[in-house]
């Protein structure tokens, strides 16, 4: 099975109205949703880390492709590292932001700011590869500890959590609603149940 021969990666782009890539992020995915309706959505990823070796050259062919086709706007590219030949295979290109796109904002690069600067203020920007180490997780740390199969990735995610560099876009400190807090507690409990019951 494809699932057993490598690792999944998320690559995000913002391409300007001048058809130039302004921002790239490249993150390794550690976990995905396990319920049938959520398959394909990641629940944990780590930016600035790659257990197969972090190399800026990985994204260069994708950058050239996006500019060659004259792409404009947001894009998310799903990739698979194939350990049989050491190459990254493109699975699909989504012409939008992803559910997990918040990790760019957490790393200091707000995608909407790029859009506004480009379309409203006509700002030209050099291409930036976001290297900031940041983890995005929708699941509690106990799920990360138990179900991330890659030891290097698991250790990196937990290290970032300890350093305060793991974010959950569903959690907002200023939202002190008891109803909201209960919802998030139940969501964590449900994630624990799902990962225990369902196989990926």
Identify the residue ranges that each predicted region occupies.
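A short glycine-rich, hydrophobically flanked beta-strand micro-motif that places a catalytic Asp/Glu
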Residues: 72-84
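Conserved protein kinase catalytic/activation segment
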Residues: 86-89
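ATP-dependent carboxylate/phosphate-activation module, predominantly the ATP-grasp catalytic core
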Residues: 1-70, 94-119
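Peripheral (often C-terminal) accessory segments that flank ATP-dependent C-N-forming ligase machineries
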Residues: 117-200
């Amino acid at each position: 099975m494809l699932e057993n021969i490598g690792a999944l990666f998320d690559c995000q782009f913002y391409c300007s109205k001048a058809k130039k890539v302004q921002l790239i992020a490249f993150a390794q995915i550690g976990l995905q949703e396990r319920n049938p309706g959520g398959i394909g959505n990641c629940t944990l990823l780590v930016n600035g880390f790659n257990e197969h070796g972090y190399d800026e050259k990985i994204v260069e062919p994708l950058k050239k492709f996006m500019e060659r086709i004259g792409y404009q706007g947001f894009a998310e590219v799903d990739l698979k590292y194939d350990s049989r030949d050491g190459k990254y295979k493109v699975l699909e290109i989504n012409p939008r932001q992803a559910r997990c796109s918040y990790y760019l904002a957490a790393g200091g690069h707000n995608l909407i700011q790029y859009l506004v600067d480009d379309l409203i203020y006509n700002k030209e920007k050099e291409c930036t590869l976001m290297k900031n180490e940041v983890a995005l997780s929708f699941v509690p740390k106990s799920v990360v500890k138990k179900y991330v199969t890659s030891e290097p990735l698991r250790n990196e995610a937990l290290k970032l959590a300890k350093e305060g560099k793991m974010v959950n876009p569903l959690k907002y400190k200023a939202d002190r609603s008891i109803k909201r807090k209960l919802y998030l507690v139940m969501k964590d409990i449900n994630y624990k149940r799902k990962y225990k019951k369902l196989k990926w």
